[in-house]
Every structure is written in C-alpha cells, then in structure tokens.
C-alpha cells in the first residue's frame, strides 16, 4: 500500500523502501532509510502530510505491538470479544486507552498553528510511536515538556507480551493500576473482566517495573552528570534506550563515548525482562 508513494518519490528503489519500512514498523524497530531527504535523521517527518503513510505505519506498529496471542484470539473468535483470553482483553483495552488519552493531550498542547486534520494525525502518530516503535513525524524536541513526560511514560510501558515491542508491557502496567484501584477501594482481591489476579502476578509486575525504573533513572542521572545536560533530556534518552524505542530529542549524536556506552548497556538490559503470565 505504501509502494505507490515511495515509488513516486524514489523510483524503483521505492519498492525496497516500502518493504523495509513495513517490516521496521511491524517489528517496532523504528529504523528508516530516508536520511537522504532533507537532513541526516528525518525519520518520517517528510511524510507528516501523507495520511496513507501515517495510517499504514500506525496500523503496523499497533499490529506488531499487541502480541501474537492477541492476534490468535482475534483470528479465532473474530468479534466475539467475550471469548477472548483475559490477557487479550486487558491488552486491547489498555492499548486503546494509551493511544487515545495521550493523543488528546498532544492535540491540546502541540501543533496549534496547523490545520485540524494534520494536527490530529500528528497527535495520533506521536501517541502510537513511543510504545517502542521509534518513528516520528514531528520535531519531538519542540513539543511541550508535559508531552515529552507523557512520551517517557508511554515508552516505559511499551507494548504487550509475546509482541515485538519492549517496555514493562501493557499487562504489567494494567496489573499495577488495577492493584492501586483495589487498594484505594479497600478491596482484597484484584480483578478484571470477572477474573482474579494472584499475588505472585502482582509481585512480578512490581518487580519488573522497579527493575526498569532503576535502570532508566540511574542511566539518565549518570548521563546528565557526565554530560552536564538537563536531566529531563537525559531521562528521555535513557527511557528510549532501556525500553528499546529509538526516539531522541537530538542529543544522542553529541554524547561522549561513556554516555553512549551507558545507552548501549541500557538497550541490552532493557531486553532482559519477564514476559511472564500475569493472570489466572
């Protein structure tokens, strides 16, 4: 579907470029080969006005990020959502919320000078891509501090179990959130969709989250101290590394060798985690 656009822009090479970016999006890699356009690292900013490219890339990112077991439920049960595994229900619900709510915030806080349509598609894309995809269609460094903070949270959460995405996973985030709600309401059991989470699942979720938080925060502070850069920017780069996203505020190429080594280490450690069953 992207071939006509890329062939129009790059000739016969557009065939290869459409295949490359499709795989990169579905696998949540975020690599692009468009650096010969306007600058060295444009990502998909040159296609921010192209709704076809935006929608297809977003669909592929989401498709690769919800997990293969979820797709198995969708394929097997179609629209009979009640028959889905509880994990699939949690994944689909959490994914929808993590796309819609941040997109609303981005729409309200950014791109105010743009027409409604472009503003909407930019907001949606920047809401989808932090979940370990790594593409961008806007200058992230020009977005508001609150938007960048939300993007850090989205990167931290990442995709879903059995998917191509990183982060602590949507199910882990959902378990912690449901546990907090249950605590506030003085409920002993943590439940979702009529089923109960066991204590070990909650412990696993807390452990995984704390491990990622320690790596992310320690790495960000270390880079900030060594480079003398603002902590917020360094935390953004650290979150992008440990959650294997690939987004940047533009400071990574300027970092010294030690800071780059820290980011490399965070990338490797970020892939060590527990894609463990969290429900019963």
Predicted region positions:
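Membrane-proximal intracellular helices of multi-pass ion channels
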Residues: 1-280
């Amino acid at each position: 579907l992207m071939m006509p656009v890329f062939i129009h822009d790059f000739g016969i090479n557009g065939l290869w470029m459409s295949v490359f970016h499709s795989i990169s999006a579905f696998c949540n890699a975020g690599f692009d080969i468009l650096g010969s356009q306007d600058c060295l690292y444009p990502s998909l900013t040159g296609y921010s006005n192209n709704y076809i490219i935006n929608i297809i890339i977003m669909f592929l990112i989401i498709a690769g990020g919800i997990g293969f077991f979820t797709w198995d439920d969708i394929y097997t049960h179609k629209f009979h959502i009640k028959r889905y595994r509880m994990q699939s229900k949690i994944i689909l619900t959490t994914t929808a919320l993590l796309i819609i709510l941040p997109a609303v915030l981005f729409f309200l806080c950014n791109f105010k000078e743009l027409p409604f349509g472009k503003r909407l598609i930019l907001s949606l894309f920047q809401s989808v891509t932090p979940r370990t995809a790594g593409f961008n269609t806007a200058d992230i460094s020009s977005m508001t501090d609150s938007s960048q903070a939300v993007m850090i949270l989205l990167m931290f959460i990442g995709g879903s179990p059995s998917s191509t995405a990183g982060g602590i996973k949507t199910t882990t985030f959902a378990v912690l959130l449901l546990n907090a709600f249950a605590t506030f309401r003085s409920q002993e059991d943590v439940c979702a969709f009529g089923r109960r989470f066991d204590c070990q699942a909650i412990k696993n979720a807390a452990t995984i989250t704390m491990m990622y938080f320690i790596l992310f925060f320690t790495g960000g502070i270390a880079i900030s101290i060594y480079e003398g850069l603002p902590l917020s920017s360094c935390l953004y780069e650290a979150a992008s590394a440990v959650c294997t996203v690939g987004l940047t505020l533009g400071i990574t190429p300027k970092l010294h060798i030690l800071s780059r080594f820290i980011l490399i280490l965070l990338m490797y450690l970020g892939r060590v985690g527990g894609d463990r069953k969290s429900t019963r």
